[in-house]
Amino acid sequence: MIQMESLLKAADNSGARQVQCIKVLGGSKRRYAGIGDIVKVSVKDAIPRGRVKKGEVYNAVVVRSKRGVRRADGSQIRFDGNAAVLLNNNLQPIGTRVFGPVTRELRNERFMRIISLAPEVL
């Protein structure tokens, strides 16, 4: 469950290390974002010579969350931390690699490119 001010790990090689959620997209009263939801983020920590710089604002899709996601069969998948993949204005990934596992729920949310880049899909 991601809300404003939540810190997330960047799960790609865009150059960001840590990002902070500044808005949950999808309605003016929407408070929380889960796996597969798009959020507006600000880069809080970046590596030198990366594609993104500290302070820049991007769209991002949440790929892992501590809250997890419940499946239709009753099972639930949770992760140790919150992570997101940075997106450009066309909602395409900025990075060329995705680190760590992602869930199958991204397939429904038109993020097939992230699914194909991920090393493991749960």
Curated annotation (Swiss-Prot):
Biological process (GO) annotations held by this record are: translation
Alphabetical GO CC annotations of the entry are:
cytosolic large ribosomal subunit
The record's annotation in SUPFAM superfamilies points to: Ribosomal protein L14
CDD domains hit by this protein: Ribosomal_uL14
Q: Which Pfam families match?
A: Ribosomal_L14
What keywords appear on the UniProt entry? Ribonucleoprotein, Ribosomal protein, RNA-binding, rRNA-binding
Q: Identify the Gene3D superfamilies for this entry.
A: Ribosomal protein L14
Q: Which GO terms describe its molecular function?
A: large ribosomal subunit rRNA binding; structural constituent of ribosome
InterPro entries from the xrefs?
A: Ribosomal_uL14, Ribosomal_uL14_bac-type, Ribosomal_uL14_CS, Ribosomal_uL14_sf
Protein purpose: Binds to 23S rRNA. Forms part of two intersubunit bridges in the 70S ribosome.
Q: Which family does it belong to?
A: Belongs to the universal ribosomal protein uL14 family.
* Complex formation: Part of the 50S ribosomal subunit. Forms a cluster with proteins L3 and L19. In the 70S ribosome, L14 and L19 interact and together make contacts with the 16S rRNA in bridges B5 and B8.
User: Could you tell me which HAMAP family the record lists for this protein?
Assistant: Ribosomal_uL14
Task: Give the protein name, as stated in the record.
Answer: Large ribosomal subunit protein uL14
**Source lineage:** Bacteria, Pseudomonadati, Pseudomonadota, Gammaproteobacteria, Chromatiales
